[in-house]
C-alpha cells in the first residue's frame, strides 16, 4: 500500500519451548486421520442417512489429520480438528440408530481420542517466551488446550463481516486514508494525543433489579463517543444502533464506603449472567468486600447492533471498526472512573479485565490518571495478530490481494495499542496474569505487555484461557495489587489458596 508505515512488531517472538514438545506428539495426527476414515467408511456402509450424518466430522477429521502429518500446520488446523472431534462426539449418539451401537461407540471413542490428540498437537506448536514456566503435559491440560482451540474456532466462524470482495476493498481504502490522516496529526508518533478527553458522567440512569437472590443495579448512559471528524469509518460507526448506550451492572455494599473494582469482560461476553460467572461476586464482592461495576464493552451484549452474536465485529479484520472499538471502550471507562470518583465518592478505584477486557484496562492504565491500580488477565493486547493468525484463509488472502498485511493493521491500531502507550498507573500498582497454555490469547501477549510495562508483578498459572481468577495464582497477584493500592487491608485474604 502506497505510503504504508512500517511498524515494528512489539510482540516478544520467542522460540518454542523445547520442554513442551515430544517428537512422538507429531504422530498424534494419526488419531484424527484414522477416526475420520472410520467415520467415512462406516457411514458409506450404512446408507444415505449415515452418510449425511458422518460426512462433515469424517471429512474434517481426515483432512486435518492428513494436514498435521503431511503439510505445514497452523492454528486453523487445530481449530477445525477440535471442531470435528466435538461434532464427532455429539453425532456419535444419533449414529446408534443409523450405524449401530458398536459402530457408534467406536466413533465416539475415536472422536474423544481425536479431541485429546488435538490438545497435544496444539501444545507441540505452542509458542512461549523462555521466562514463562513450562506447562504440565498431562491429558487434563491437553484437553484444556483443545477446548481453547474449539472456542477460537467458534469465535472466528461467527465473526462478521467476512472481509472479502468489496469489504476488503473498503478496508484497504479506509486504511490508506487513515494512514495519511494519522501521519498528518502525529497520532502514530504520539498515540496518546489521538484520544479526546470525555465529558463528565454526572447523571446516569440507575435502576435496581433482582437477579438470583442478588440486588443488582443497572446503570445506563449515553456514551457521546464519536470518531474524529475526518476519520474513515466514522459514519458507519455512528450508524450502529444500540452501541451508543452504555450499560453496566453494579454490586455495592450499603453499609459503608468501599473500594470500587471495574470488571471488564472479554470478547463475546457482555450479558449479566456471563459477567457474574466470569467475575465471581462471591469472591470479589463478598469475600474481598469490594464494590463491583461491570460495564459492557462497545458492540457487545445489549450494545451489539445485530443483537444475535455479541461482539461479532470485534475480531473481523475490519480495521477501523476494531480501532473505534478500542477508542470508545477507553472513553466509556474513563467516564465511569470520573463518575465513581466525583459522584459516588469512591475512595479508591481499580480495574480488572479478562482477555479483550484485559486489553481495555491496559489501555485505560495508559490514559487515566485517576485509576489506582490495574490487573490485566490474559490480556489480548495485539488484536491484529489474533485476527491474522486465526481468521479464515479466504479473509486473509482477500486482504493480502488488496495490499493489507498483518503489519498494516498493527500499525493502524497503534493509537489504541497498550504496547505503544506509556502506563500512568504506578509500577507497583499494575499487574498481569495469564495461563501458560492459553490458546486463545497466547502467553506471548501477556509477556509483551509485561516487558512494555517495565516488568511489574506477573503470575502464570497452569491452565488455559477460561480459568482466569479461578486460578490461585491469579487471585494472589490480584490481592497483592489491591493491597498495594490500599484497596484491601493487609489482613484481608480471599480464597487465593484455593484453585478451582
Language-model-detected regions and their locations in the chain:
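Short beta-strand/loop motif that positions the catalytic acidic residue
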Residues: 425-426, 431-434
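Hydrolase active-site cap/lid region
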Residues: 360-409, 460
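Conserved alpha/beta-hydrolase "acid-adjacent" motif
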Residues: 439-445, 470
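Cap/lid segment of the alpha/beta-hydrolase catalytic domain
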Residues: 265-328
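Short beta-strand element of the alpha/beta-hydrolase
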Residues: 258-266
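Alpha/beta-hydrolase fold nucleophile elbow
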Residues: 344-355
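Catalytic histidine-centered segment of alpha/beta-hydrolase-like enzymes
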Residues: 464-475
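N-terminal targeting or regulatory segments adjacent to alpha/beta-hydrolase or S9 domains
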Residues: 2-233, 499-500
